[in-house]
């Protein structure tokens, strides 16, 4: 089964907790703090795999979780950092945040890696909090929580050349003749239900990847038929081979068919018609093909709706008429055509996990005497506070005061003994 869209839940590992410990060696009185730092949590990383052609592996496995870092230890020993969880995906996979729609990255290069959920840093042990006023601190941080999100992966096949056209115009037959691919071929519409890839190799040593895309029909850009589900795969192609059936068996006007497919391409993305396009007149071994081709060329010559008049190459996949000339022209176009930018990907600003601005805290007053605090920075500080040690709690209180939380609570109407809630933890407000 070909799967080209999937949602996956990913959870990076939390950092290990820092430790509160003291030196207790013989003959070392008042040895001081010796609690080590926690290890880094594992990240969830996508890695390109040239052997994969579909996202089928994610049909039943939808959750991936990286391991947490090890806790800090005595004698200033740092906990073990966790290994990253590597998820292999096919080339051409675009990754977005399923909740926000933010583009995270695009997997287009061999062995490329993309961090989609970053592991939390380890909490600091009490060796970091010693001072002249407090030489033996009972303060240590919990590990930073790892990122947790749902990502959407979308596969857009990586091919240099895309075959487009109505169903049963001969796309799969052409691919099977000029490459070693073996697509399903039958005498009915929509035989091809998934993209098929093949490598074309010319006698002069040039080669390129060709994709046979499922047949389009009117309204495809709006989801009719297989529709937009496979139009996305055209985005990465550099040259479009537009196949037109000249046999007349379907009793369609080849020129009208040509315009209908171009209309669907334009409706999906107007820039697609700016790409090099070759009209491939197929089934030229049929009796009426020559007459239909001449009529098509005459209409095309007077058509002023196109930005450029495409070259027309008559071929027959059965007799192999015209195939060498077609492939040579295609290779020539590829030699002079650069990669086209993928909209929303090439201008992507990759996430910077170290400089991302923290959200301001907010205060909610759902009922009299209850104030709920929330906010990314505030909640992260809370999660990294070791609630088992009073000095850690006092440090957290100072951090809140430094953020202006105390003043904001007073301004919101908080009074002595009112309940303050952060996540699942509650305490009393003391003015």
Curated annotation (Swiss-Prot):
HAMAP family: GTPase_Obg
Protein residues bound to GTP: 165-172, 190-194, 212-215, 282-285, 316-318
Top EC class, one word: hydrolase
Disulfide bonds: none
GO cellular component: cytoplasm
Name the UniProt record assigns to this protein: GTPase Obg
Protein family membership: Belongs to the TRAFAC class OBG-HflX-like GTPase superfamily. OBG GTPase family.
Any Gene Ontology biological process: ribosome biogenesis
RNA-binding found in the keyword field: no
Domain annotation Obg: ranges: 1-158
Ligand binding (Mg(2+)): 172, 192
Native source organism of the sequence: Lactiplantibacillus plantarum (strain ATCC BAA-793 / NCIMB 8826 / WCFS1)
Top-rank taxon, per record: Bacteria
Entries under PROSITE patterns matching the protein: G_OBG, GTP1_OBG, OBG, OCT
Localization: Cytoplasm
Function recorded in the entry: An essential GTPase which binds GTP, GDP and possibly (p)ppGpp with moderate affinity, with high nucleotide exchange rates and a fairly low GTP hydrolysis rate. Plays a role in control of the cell cycle, stress response, ribosome biogenesis and in those bacteria that undergo differentiation, in morphogenesis control.
OCT domain span: 353-431
Self-association and partners: Monomer.
Ranges for domain OBG-type G: 159-335
Enzyme Commission number(s) of this protein: 3.6.5.-
Gene3D superfamilies documented for this protein: GTP-binding protein OBG, C-terminal domain (3.30.300.350), GTP1/OBG domain (2.70.210.12), P-loop containing nucleotide triphosphate hydrolases (3.40.50.300)
Pfam families: DUF1967, GTP1_OBG, MMR_HSR1
Residue ranges that the Swiss-Prot or TrEMBL entry lists as coiled coil: none
Keyword tags: Cytoplasm, GTP-binding, Hydrolase, Magnesium, Metal-binding, Nucleotide-binding
């Amino acid at each position: 089964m070909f799967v080209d869209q999937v949602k996956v839940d990913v959870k990076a590992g939390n950092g290990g907790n820092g430790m509160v410990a003291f030196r207790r060696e013989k003959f070392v009185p008042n040895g001081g703090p010796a609690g080590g730092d926690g290890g880094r949590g594992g990240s969830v990383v996508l890695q390109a795999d040239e052997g994969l052609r579909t996202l089928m592996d994610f049909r039943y496995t939808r959750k991936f979780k990286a391991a947490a870092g090890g806790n800090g230890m005595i004698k200033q020993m740092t906990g073990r950092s966790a290994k990253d969880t590597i998820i292999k995906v096919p080339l051409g996979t675009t990754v977005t945040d399923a909740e926000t729609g933010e583009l995270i990255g695009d997997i287009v290069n061999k062995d490329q890696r993309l961090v989609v959920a970053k592991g939390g840093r380890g909490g600091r042990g009490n060796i970091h909090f010693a001072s002249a006023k407090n030489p033996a601190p009972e303060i240590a941080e919990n590990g930073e929580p790892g990122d947790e999100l749902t990502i959407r992966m979308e596969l857009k096949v990586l091919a240099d050349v895309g075959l487009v056209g109505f169903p049963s115009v001969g796309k799969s037959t052409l691919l099977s003749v000029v490459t070693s691919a073996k697509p399903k071929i039958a005498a009915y519409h929509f035989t091809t239900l998934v993209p098929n890839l093949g490598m074309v190799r010319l006698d002069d040593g040039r080669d390129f990847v060709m994709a046979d895309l499922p047949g389009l029909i009117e309204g495809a850009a709006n989801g009719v038929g297989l529709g937009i589900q496979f139009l996305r795969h055209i985005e990465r192609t550099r040259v479009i081979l537009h196949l037109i059936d000249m046999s007349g068996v379907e009793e369609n006007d080849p020129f009208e068919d040509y315009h209908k497919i171009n209309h669907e391409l334009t409706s999906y993305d107007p820039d697609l018609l700016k790409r090099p396009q070759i009209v491939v007149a197929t089934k030229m071994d049929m009796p009426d093909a020559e007459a239909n081709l001449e009529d098509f060329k005459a209409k095309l010559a007077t058509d002023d709706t196109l930005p450029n008049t495409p070259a027309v190459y008559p071929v027959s996949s059965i007799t192999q008429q015209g195939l060498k000339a077609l492939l040579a022209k295609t290779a020539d176009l590829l030699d002079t055509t650069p990669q086209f930018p993928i909209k929303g990907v090439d201008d992507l600003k990759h996430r910077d996990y170290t400089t991302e601005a923290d959200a301001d805290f907010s205060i909610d007053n759902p009922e009299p005497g209850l104030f709920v605090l929330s906010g990314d920075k505030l909640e992260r500080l809370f999660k990294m506070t070791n609630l088992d040690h009073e000095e850690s709690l006092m440090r957290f209180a100072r951090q809140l005061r430094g953020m202006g939380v105390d003043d904001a609570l007073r301004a919101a109407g908080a009074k002595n003994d009112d309940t303050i809630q952060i996540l699942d933890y509650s305490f009393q407000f003391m003015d």
